[in-house]
Amino acid sequence: MYTHVDVVGIAEASAALYVQKDRDRYLDVLTAIENFIYQHKCIITGESAHLLFLKKSIYLYECYSNNVAEHSKALATLLYKLDPEYLTRYTVLITKVPNQSYVINVDQREFVRLYAIPAVKEHLPIPILPFHCTSALTQQELFCLGPELQLIQIYSKLCNPNFVEEWPTLLDYEKNMRTLFLEQFSQRLEMTGGKKEEEEKHKSIIKKIILEMVSTRQRIVVGGYIQKNLYNHVVKNRNRLQLITSLNIYEEKEIIQQFCDSNGLKIKIRINNPLLPTNPELRRLTIYFNNNDDQSYLIVDMYNTGSYELVPTNEVNTLDGSFLIGTPFVQARFLLVEIWVLMLIAQQTKKDTKKIIQFFINQYETLMNGPWPSMEALFPSSSKRYLGNYVDPNALIKWAQLKLKRIPLFYPGRPDEEE
């Protein structure tokens, strides 16, 4: 009998209808949330931003706020007052981390997650270049993270086995978001051409430094110099090497400085913050080689991602030896980090970075449009293929909660709270 009746299809259709009817009960709640986000210029992030870009319905809003404690309390009070005798009677504000992270539940359902904008240092928030997107629900122009930041978030999860259940959905988001990203960038920046790469005069010395950088299994290649061997010269070569380290970034600085000093190599090392709002822990170590004419060549960018994340890798053999290289999603993630940094430079210094951004976009497009490797190369199943250190985000939240004063749940309907 079951071969002639689409039992699963009928069940799915019935369930979808029931779920939609159930969600429609909260239409006023969702509308009030979007109006609040619009009025207070909150910036939508996470999966909410993906759905906003794709003109789909949102049922859980994740937002950055420039006044997160006050905004979360005001929004919880607003939602309670919508229908205090019935649907929104049980509205509660949960403080995850004081002045950093809050959750609002209505009728025992999670509707809002509000985050403080990460700070470069105290009282100096990381700059965010938000986009405007039209909401499918209220038709208002809402702020959200740009597609480059959303793609960085997506690639980060596609590299993390903790999100394996979300991978099918994330792959759909990635495809759509990548299309939007490539379309809007050429229009917004009106880019043409790419940056011409000059031949370096000190290739042998630079190559010596670069090969030392990739000689240890504590570092992973994510782009630049080595790519010419990986992609048979399809990806245009840059003499800069991009790496991820699993060591502390300041330990790396000492190790590299000692190697170069012992070999009589003149270098400068700088450590900076790429100002990535979705990844405030990220730091970048940059190595410059100095020749006898006091000219500097940027030869290595090293990120500290492996010191707090597990990074999936593949081992490859090239003309220069055998190295660990990040999976395609890891490489795509850090190409977009480069693009983000250049966008910030353009905004803050008014420098023309169009050509170099186009160069990285061309690399990104070539990488993502090229022949895809095997499933094992995209999503390694062996723990030996992951390098770095895993830090449980829930443990970090609990650790932060222990160090800070505990704040009880806020119920907008309580008379003592209203007083």
From Swiss-Prot:
Major localization class: virion
An annotated GO cellular component: virion component
Keywords: Late protein, Virion
Location of the protein in the cell: Virion
Superkingdom, natural source: Viruses
Conditions for induction: Expressed in the late phase of the viral replicative cycle.
Stated family: Belongs to the asfivirus K421R family.
UniProt protein name: Uncharacterized protein K421R
Organism of this sequence: African swine fever virus (isolate Pig/Kenya/KEN-50/1950) (ASFV)
Classification lineage: Viruses, Varidnaviria, Bamfordvirae, Nucleocytoviricota, Pokkesviricetes
